[in-house]
Amino acid sequence: MANGAEAYNGPPASTKHAAEHWTGITTLTKVRLDWLREPGIGSLVRRGLRGVEKESLRVTPDGRLSRRPHPAALGSALTHPYLTTDYSEALLEFVTPPHPANWQTLGFLSDLHAFVHRRLDGERLWPCSMPCVINANEEIPIARYGSSNLGMMKTVYRRGLGYRYGRAMQAIAGVHFNYSPPSAFWEALRERAPSDVPLERLKSERMMALARNYRRLSWLVIYLFGASPALCKSFRPDGHPLLSELDPATWYAPYATSLRMSDIGYRNSTQARLCISLNSIDEYVSGLARAVSTVEPSYAQIGVEVDGEYRQLNANILQIENEYYSSIRPKPAKGNTSERPTVALRRHGVEYVEIRTLDLNPSDPVGVNQNQLRFLETLLVHCLLADSPPIGADEQREIDARDLAAAREGRRPGLELPRGGSKAELAAWAREVLDGLHEVAELLDEAGEGYVAAVEAQREAVDDPAATPSGRLLDALRASGESFFEHVRGIADRHHEYFLALPVDAAREAELDALAASSLDEQVALEKSDTLSFAEYLARYFSVV
């Protein structure tokens, strides 16, 4: 076996705590780094594919939630590849295709924003994760996708989310970062793996290893990039023990980084009881399969089809796999939309990972910036190369506790996080991780892409919590004397003006106009092609396991 054979490392038998594996770059990782420095090898990892999915609420000029339907000028939310909706009809989702460079991804995202802003007819995009003024669940319109079975399934699924968790929670917005090492990287790694290891298995096992290591360090991403320490009182009119009053219209948590990632945001007690293991692709798929086939009594009380209307797709713990919330998702290749994610993962393995930890960055018009993506990519390559023992029950509890602590009080001076049965100061541990990331950043930086600078830029935020996005937002609120709603509405106006002032790329505009038109035609064709009743369609969809 050639030098670098250690680059293949299937799930080990060791169940040591992660603390023993995150004291910087491990010896085995150094072997992999040395391999990547070999001529012709290092450039492979730099050609990974990156994509972004970014959500934003449409709001009226005075900052209220839009009640208008999805603009026809943007095409069909069901069939458009780049412009769709998430939970609400007002919650736009921008989806970039995968690109081999972060600047290309952000350039495409900016083009999408410019296109949309010119077609909002006076509306704005809300630039923060926590929503605008919301006075009642009923004010949040569920996304509509037309009369096709696929479109109805999407709408009923969202109706079920509203019954289960409340519509307000589903109006929270975020940024997802998708990442996949290039095919050539896996081929090179395959040459150094045991000869009997199929490429698909090698790829899936390393991507699951990456996912485990990301979960071990997701607290750091929450600390560095959380940008939701405050919210409009209309979101939680009854308050919460974590929240204090900043002004008559604003709740805040003094040391919070991301209320979105806290128990005020996406967390819920039913999903908290789920044990979806990342220790192997088989365990992950089996865990999801159990959740989408096991009835939850409290959801059964809601009913499925009541008085001729579907309230939810079913009464199971998860209606479909996408209902499961995690900070990272292993994903199959995008392709057949009628194929369930668990089926696709079992058949084809893991193609990429979806990072779901990012709040919208209100300082950037597209909600995320180059430094953030470069840092995330560096972290993911690190997670790919580092040892990744299985995650046991004790470590999983520590991981969850770390994420929650970082979200609720990450900027608290001297905050300690659970680590390997002991405690570690957040700032000291963060510096340790940044030191370990430096070598990976240097490798990625050989083409002068700014990865080292992106990693080093985070040291200021570690040394000074006020320099984090959450710290800066709170300081801005205090300095302005404005409520959260007033301050963010002003940012929304400035972002809108920014995109309207950008030069028009005529070729891109024509391309997106054509896509919008063709997507509307595609939706109509889909509606005409249905031959099954909705009940038959659901039965067929859920019959494939």
Predicted feature locations:
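Terminal catalytic/cofactor-binding subdomain
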Residues: G10, S14-G162, M169-V175, L202-R212, ...
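Histidine-centered divalent-metal-coordination microenvironment in nucleic-acid enzymes
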Residues: E55, M169-P182, Y352-D359
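Substrate-recognition/cap regions that form aromatic- and gly/pro-loop-enriched pockets
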Residues: L345-R347, V353-L444
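Loop-rich catalytic cores of soluble enzymes, especially ATP-dependent carboxylate-amine ligases
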Residues: R37-E38, G146-R167, A171, Y179-R346, ...
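Short conserved micro-motifs at the rims of enzyme active sites and ligand-binding pockets
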Residues: R67-H70, L106, E139, L189-R190, ...
